Structure formats: C-alpha cells, structure tokens
Curated annotation (Swiss-Prot):
The lineage of its organism: Eukaryota, Metazoa, Chordata, Craniata, Vertebrata. Residues 25-253 form the Peptidase S1 domain. It comes from Crotalus adamanteus (Eastern diamondback rattlesnake). The keyword Transcription regulation does not apply. Keywords: Disulfide bond, Glycoprotein, Hemostasis impairing toxin, Hydrolase, Protease, Secreted, Serine protease, Signal, Toxin, Zymogen. InterPro entries: Peptidase_S1_PA, Peptidase_S1_PA_chymotrypsin, Peptidase_S1A, Trypsin_dom, TRYPSIN_HIS. This is Snake venom serine proteinase 9.
Length: 262
C-alpha cells in the first residue's frame, strides 16, 4: 500500500527537496471499516479535489502535515468510500490553523505539522472517534500501521476510493540519512524513519498528513518519501508527534503563549 504525500507550494519554497503531494499506501489492503474512525480526509473547497489525510484528536481539532494546507479546504469525517456517504459522515471547515514556529533545536525537517481547529465540534458516532496523542516515545523496531487514500501504484497514479492500510517498520533515523544523502539530513532530528527495506510497501502521494500508529500509539504524520514510492532501501520520513506534544497541547488548551518543546 503506497501512501502518497501532498506537495505544498510553501514547503517547495522552503525546502530543497521534492515532497510527495499526498501519499498513498502501496502494497497494502483496504482498511477494515472499523479501524480508521479517527482518519479524516482534506479536500480543496473549490475543485473538490482530495488533498491529504489527517487525524481527529478531539471534537474540535485535527492534526495533519503543514504542506497539506490550502487557503480553501474542507474536512470529511467518517468517510470510508469517497463515493458512498455514511449517514453519520460530517463535513467541517478550518476555523483556525496553527503552524509550528519554534526554532530552538528544530530544523526545517522537523516542522511539517499543522493543527486545524474546526468551525464547529464533531459528534462522535459509529464511524467517527478521536485518536489519543502518544504517552511514550516510539521505539525503533516497532511495527507501525500506515493508512490513507493515497496512490496504490507508483509511478503510475492509481487512486483508490477506499483507504488502504499497511504495516511498515520503524527504523533508526540514521538509515534514512544513509538512504537519502542528497538531502544532507541533519545528524539529529525530530522526524521518524519508517518503511520496508525490501521495498514494495510504502506510503505514497496523497497520504500526507495521515497517521503512523506504532504499537497502538499515534507516533507519526506522513511527511516525505522517495518518488517512485516503495523502492528498496528507501524509507520515508514522518513528523514525530511525541516531540511536538507541548506545542500541540498548549494550543488546544488555548494558552496565549505557545510552549516550544525543549
């Protein structure tokens, strides 16, 4: 299952590498209808084009990747098949958007994260429920679950109507530094490295912003990966949710001064 990441013009200007526009899971299977109640879909309001995934944190907040941002966008919650609407599906708009502006000990690779406050609270239902933030850091070697409506083939673009899910492995960050020398990744980072080194399973375009769930905890946000997707020895990068907890929680709490992680 290939998760596809959505390219954002803002990050194209800021970053010297190419991101996937939205990533889809390659080498996976259709997600069980009950396993992604927290998974949301971001759409462009004018073109009605599917952009990215995201994760519902509570009745009012969604966490996704910053490069998924568009001026005009809406969020579908409780969706499985894009073309078949559940009775409890809900649509919301972004009331507020928050971007990570902290500079201390954070590089440009560590900031692809965005909090969206919805225009009105969501009602939990059979197909809509939140995903909790992690309570402990991720461990290298963990088996992680990736999911999204991104491409299922690469480089040919095949977009599914239903979300696909796949298991990938959480790898040592140094594996990604070695795999992608052209990007000169910093020696230390608050991003996660994950994939299947044998190839064939990966996130891909239009899965950006979706969750990476490791040992049952929400540990990563789909961020960047090689193109074509699912190449051997070419794992992808994921924003590390645990290292952004202070920032996330201070914004949701409505604090006037945002807490930057140490």
């Amino acid at each position: 299952m290939v998760l596809i990441r959505v390219l954002a013009n803002l990050l194209i200007l800021q970053l010297s590498y190419a991101q996937k526009s939205s990533e889809l899971v390659i080498g996976g299977d259709e997600c069980n209808i009950d396993e992604h109640r927290f998974l949301v879909a971001l759409y462009h309001s004018r073109s009605k084009t599917f952009l990215c995934g995201g994760t519902l944190l509570n009745e009012e907040w969604v966490l996704t990747a910053a490069h998924c941002n568009r001026v005009f966008m809406y969020i579908r919650l409780g969706m499985h098949n894009k073309n078949v609407k559940f009775d409890d599906e809900q649509i919301r708009y972004a009331k507020e958007k928050y971007f990570f502006r902290c500079h201390n000990n954070f590089t440009r690779w560590d900031k692809d994260i965005m909090l969206i406050r919805l225009n009105k609270p969501v009602s939990y239902s059979e197909h809509i429920a939140p995903l909790s933030l992690p309570f402990s850091p991720p461990s290298v070697g963990s088996v992680c679950r990736a999911m999204g409506w991104g491409q299922t083939t690469s480089p040919q673009e095949t977009l599914p109507d239903v979300p696909h899910c796949a298991n990938i492995n959480l790898l040592d960050y140094e594996v990604c530094r070695t795999a992608h020398p052209q990007f000169r990744l910093p020696a230390t980072s608050r991003t996660l490295c994950a994939g299947v080194l044998e190839g064939g399973i990966d996130t891909c375009n239009r899965d950006s912003g979706g969750p990476l769930i490791c040992n049952g905890q929400f540990q990563g946000i789909v961020f960047w990966g090689p193109d074509p997707c699912a190449q051997p020895d070419k794992p992808g990068l994921y924003t590390k949710v645990f290292d952004h907890l202070d920032w996330i929680q201070s914004i949701i709490a409505g604090e006037k001064t945002v807490n930057c992680p140490p």
